[in-house]
Swiss-Prot record:
Species the sequence originates in: Mycoplasma pneumoniae (strain ATCC 29342 / M129 / Subtype 1)
Lipid-binding residues (covalent, N-palmitoyl cysteine): 28
Phylogenetic lineage: Bacteria, Bacillati, Mycoplasmatota, Mycoplasmoidales, Mycoplasmoidaceae
Residue positions bearing lipid (S-diacylglycerol cysteine): 28
InterPro entries in the cross-refs: DUF3713 (IPR022186)
Location within or outside the cell: Membrane
Pfam families in UniProt: DUF3713
Identification of the protein by name: Uncharacterized lipoprotein MPN_442
Similarity comment: Belongs to the MG307/MG309/MG338 family.
């Protein structure tokens, strides 16, 4: 061990490893906060109700709404359930999931094809009439339409 400590190569490699690892750690840690602030910088009066935006503000604002809270909880749960059905050891469960998914997709496509006229753009119909029949975003606390397309 004494011979190893005397060699200058050992000290250069140790110093180089320490410097490179510290540079990498600093480079990875520093821009994350500034990048987050740049992405969520308020560019208009309506972004996060005019406040300087951050991820914490967005999450806190979103979770105050009961519907958003349900979606926040349901999204990971639905992904986990989908993965459980797809990767289940019991082939009957997996096949049931695939058949149900295929059936729902076919029913949706048939419903869209029945209602869409030949002269109308299918994507426009799906967006305006089927998915967004109210013509705007509804306020969950009151039944009135907040924004209406003209």
């Amino acid at each position: 061990m004494k011979k190893l400590l005397i060699k200058p190569q050992f000290w250069f490699l140790t110093l180089g490893g320490f410097i490179s690892s510290s540079v990498i750690l600093v480079a990875c840690a520093t821009p994350s906060n500034s990048a987050l602030q740049t992405v969520f910088k308020a560019r208009s009066n309506q972004f996060f109700n005019g406040e300087q935006g951050s991820l914490q503000n967005a999450l806190a604002t979103a979770l105050k709404d009961p519907e958003a809270n349900k979606q926040f909880v349901a999204a990971p749960l639905l992904k986990a359930l989908t993965a459980w059905y797809e990767n289940n050891q019991d082939k009957q469960v997996t096949q049931f999931f695939k058949d149900t998914k295929k059936s729902v997709d076919e029913q949706y496509n048939q419903a869209v094809d029945k209602v869409v006229s030949a002269s109308r753009n299918k994507n426009l119909f799906v967006q305006q009439d089927l998915l967004d029949s109210a013509g705007g975003v509804r306020n969950l606390k009151s039944p009135e339409v907040v924004w209406t397309a003209h």
